[in-house]
Amino acid sequence: MTSDFRMVFDARDELLASARECEAEVFLRAFGNTRAQLDEEYGPYEDSSVFLVLADQTDMVHAMVRLIAPGGPAGLKTLVDIGGAPWGVDGSRAASAVGIDMTSTWEVATLGVRRGSSAHGTRLSLALYHGLLTGARVNAASSFVAILDDRVRHLLGSVGILTRALPGTASAPYLGSGSSTPVYAHFAPLVENQRKNYPEAYRLVTLGIGLDGVAVPAPDEFKVRERVGQHLDSARDWSDLSVGRIPVA
């Protein structure tokens, strides 16, 4: 089967440049964030950033997720940012209160699909979610944190990617979004709940069954290349969950 798009985890070189262009286009349109503002916000996390992308046959990126891996010198942006306005919450204490292991918790920092990809928008969004969950499993992530625009949070919840607000936080304006919430989720119970209560989404988003037109790489290609000074724990796994091998669409 011919694929319109291919998925790449930890994009580099030309794909990385195209991913940044996609990120800038989406965030300017949705929230009014300029490229300079994005550079200022995410620059401290650059060495820890990992891009998951969906590219066409010309290597133009149509959809992307910027992840922040654990162990970087700047920490996780969500836990840093909730310490300031409008929340004023100690990120370390909030994380500790809900059992977040900082050595294996990742951040979903940005996520977007180009407007010109609207004909494939839903498919690309679902493929991004699949790549996110696959990358988390392969890299032994225990949890994730994010500050999600409430519309995006609702879309994730509709496919069983359910999140909770970090303690002491609530929906508030953030970086051009009129309503965003600092959230977290523990991956293993999230996937188990999805399997039980969102079985169709579990097959599509977690197992990747039915992602037609998107070439998904083998699981070992989701292994992130370790960054200097970071410890990515490969000892953990989700072996108690029937996630199975990820098929190629």
Model regions and ranges:
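Short, solvent-exposed loop/turn elements at beta->coil junctions and helix N-caps
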Residues: 37-43, 168-173
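Short amphipathic alpha-helix that is part of the acyltransferase structural core
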Residues: 1-40, 50-61
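Beta-rich nucleic-acid/ligand-interaction surfaces
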Residues: 40-46, 151-155
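A short helix-loop-beta-strand connector motif used in the catalytic cores of GNAT acetyltransferases and
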Residues: 44-53, 73-75
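Accessory, usually C-terminal, subdomains that scaffold auxiliary metal cofactors
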Residues: 163-227
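C-terminal non-catalytic accessory extensions
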Residues: 238-249
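Short, His- and charge-rich active-site/binding loops that engage polyanionic ligands
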Residues: 56-96
